[in-house]
Each structure stands twice: as C-alpha cells, then as structure tokens.
C-alpha cells in the first residue's frame, strides 16, 4: 500500500509500521491488532503442553509476503527456519486450519476458530506479545481532502473506542 501512495496511484492508504519515518509520507495512527501464534490442534506444536525454546524453528512457519520493493529482503516476525510465504491472509488462515504449518494471525480473525477448537493458541517462549500498529498514510505534498480526512479521523476514533 505504501508504494501505491508514494507513487500517487492511491491518495490515502492503511499501512503497517514497516515504513515508519519515510520522507514524504505522513502517518496517522488508526489502530492496532494483536497477533497470536496459532496452529491446528493436530499440529505437533499445538499438541505440546509446553514448547521448549526453539521448538517452533523445526516446523514450517506460514508468513504473509510483502510484495513491495520498499521491504525487499526484510523479514518481520520470522521465527522458523523453514517458511512458506503467502500473498493472502485468507490463504494463510485456510492452510493453518488444514493443519499445514503454524503462524501468527490477527486475534479477531481467529477468535471463532480458537473458541470452536479448529485452531489452538500456541505457547511459544520466543513469541512476545505482538500488536501490529496500523496507520493511515498519505503523501506530505498531497494531504487528504475533506472526505478522506473524515475517514481517517473516523478510523482513529473507532480505534480509540475499541482498544
């Protein structure tokens, strides 16, 4: 999304923290979401009562790929030495439910799966509580108009009310 905003293809976007501090880009905090490590209950990491440090490295970690050239060669939240990179969060979710690998997911997206037993929250010593911050972004030289400014403000207020 950041690349689309910087190139002028999009005037406003919602992005994560990966591009914090880029020249020519303004950012307004509009929320965050907790990322938690999960796997299907049949996965070895889910079956273990207590995973030892480093246990997750031995299993395929499903990661969301960032196709932007701005983050080329950078990894975020990678624990495993064996990973599959996916372009879509929905595909990652489907593979996790199917028992293929483990990975960090937005807690609201997997809440029903955790409650129903389709996924299990993993206890991993190397995983620290992760909140993924989200910002509305726009080019410094092209501030949002009234409608986009209202939308950004609305996102920010909604986030303050729910977090």
Predicted regions: what is each one?
Residues 20, 24-100, 105-130, 149, ...:
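C-terminal regulatory
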Residues 1-22:
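Central regulatory/effector-binding core of bacterial HTH transcription factors
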Residues 38-44, 133-144:
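A bilobed periplasmic-binding-protein/Venus flytrap-type ligand-binding module shared by bacterial periplasmic
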Residues 5-6, 87, 144:
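Generic signature of intrinsically disordered, low-complexity, basic-rich segments
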Residues 1, 91, 143-144:
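Short phosphate-engaging motifs
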Residues 9-11, 67, 126, 141-146:
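Short, charged low-complexity intrinsically disordered segments located at boundaries
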């Amino acid at each position: 999304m950041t690349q689309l905003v910087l190139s002028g293809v999009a005037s406003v976007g919602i992005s994560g923290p990966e591009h914090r501090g880029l020249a020519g880009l303004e950012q307004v905090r509009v929320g965050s979401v907790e990322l938690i490590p999960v796997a299907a209950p049949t996965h070895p990491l889910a079956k273990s009562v207590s995973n030892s440090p480093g246990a997750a490295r031995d299993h395929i970690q499903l990661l969301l790929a960032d196709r932007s050239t701005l983050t080329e060669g950078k990894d975020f939240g990678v624990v495993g030495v064996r990973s599959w990179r996916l372009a879509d969060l929905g595909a990652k979710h489907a593979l996790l439910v199917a028992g293929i690998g483990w990975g960090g997911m937005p807690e609201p997206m997997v809440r029903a799966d955790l409650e129903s037993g389709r996924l299990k929250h993993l206890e991993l010593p190397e995983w620290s509580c992760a909140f993924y911050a989200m910002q509305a972004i726009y080019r410094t030289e092209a501030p949002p108009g009234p409608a986009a400014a209202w939308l950004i403000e609305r996102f920010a207020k909604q986030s303050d009310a729910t977090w």
